[in-house]
């Protein structure tokens, strides 16, 4: 009886572990969430873009030769969205580079993130927590359990060249300015950050070229129940990019979600001043008028 119970326990555990890899969300356009592996990406419908972009990758042989002798001391975590064009382009290239460099794939952890609003860029297992992932793909290089550096959204040169530059300690990723603001928010907290908003906008915020990074970060924070941080960073985004509709619409939706309909209405009207026929703002104002 004892042996039977042990066998049943083993089978149940094995089944659970098997189910935790390559989990698919059966939406109109299916996508993967949670931990995945190469086999999952080689399975339809993902194989249609994975195999094409894997084969399209032509890594530099000279760089690969250096990675073959240096990369084995590291581990890698890659976060992607199988629904994301940048991920579909870069993650197959990552696998191509790692295969060429003879990097053992058991030292690679690949995590697919959700795209639904209430779990935006989250993983069911929470693997992205504390990893400060806000754009995908994000490819993080570790040594002895400590982060060395990361590729955010796309490489500066190529996957292989960027990995080598990270190993050499000579690399600054895309969205470094957004990452710095994220860390400042963590240091100050949303209330103090809000009080210093004008100063932050003049200093750190002045480095930003567009609103997309903070916009995505706000959505990630809001889905992760960091609403105060999301609202504060979106206020900064509105201040930095007053002629952009996106941050105003996002902040208005947050205000509406909190029942601050007057504040939401002001923001929707500001959007209409920028674009008189904006359907989202028009419909929102009609909705607010009925409340």
Predicted regions and their residues:
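Residue-level recognition of tetratricopeptide repeat
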Residues: 219, 253-254, 287
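Alpha-solenoid helical repeat scaffolds
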Residues: 215-216, 246-250, 266, 282-284
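Non-catalytic, surface beta->alpha helical segment in thiol-disulfide oxidoreductase systems
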Residues: 135, 142-178
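Helix-start (N-cap) detector for alpha-helical repeat units in TPR-like alpha-solenoids
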Residues: 211, 227-228, 245-249, 279-280
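Thioredoxin-like thiol-disulfide oxidoreductase module
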Residues: 107-141, 165-167
């Amino acid at each position: 009886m004892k042996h039977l119970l042990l066998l049943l326990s083993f089978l149940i555990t094995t089944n659970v572990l098997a189910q935790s890899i390559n989990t698919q969300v059966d939406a109109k356009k299916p996508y993967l969430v949670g931990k995945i592996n190469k086999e999952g990406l080689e399975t339809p419908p993902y194989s249609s873009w994975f195999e094409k972009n894997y084969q399209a990758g032509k890594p530099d042989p000279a760089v690969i030769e250096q990675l073959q002798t240096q990369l084995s001391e590291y581990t890698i975590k890659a976060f992607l969205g199988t629904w994301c064009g940048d991920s579909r382009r870069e993650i197959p290239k990552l696998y191509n580079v790692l295969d060429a460099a003879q990097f053992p794939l058991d030292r690679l952890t690949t995590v697919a993130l959700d795209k639904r609003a209430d779990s935006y860029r989250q993983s069911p297992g929470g693997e992205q927590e504390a990893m400060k992932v806000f754009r995908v793909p994000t490819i993080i290089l570790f040594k002895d359990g400590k982060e060395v550096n990361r590729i955010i959204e796309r490489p500066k040169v190529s996957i292989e060249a960027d990995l080598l530059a990270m190993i050499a300690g000579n690399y600054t990723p895309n969205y470094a300015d957004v990452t710095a603001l994220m860390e400042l928010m963590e240091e100050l907290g949303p209330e103090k950050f809000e009080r210093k908003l004008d100063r932050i906008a003049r200093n750190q915020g002045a480095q930003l070229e567009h609103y997309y990074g903070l916009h995505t970060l706000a959505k990630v924070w809001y889905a992760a129940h960091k609403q105060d941080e999301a609202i504060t960073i979106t206020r900064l985004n509105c201040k930095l990019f007053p002629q952009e509709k996106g941050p105003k619409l996002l902040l208005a939706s947050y205000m509406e979600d909190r029942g601050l309909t007057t504040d939401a209405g002001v923001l929707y009207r500001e959007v209409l001043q920028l674009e008189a026929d904006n359907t989202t703002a028009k419909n929102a104002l009609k909705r607010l008028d009925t409340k």
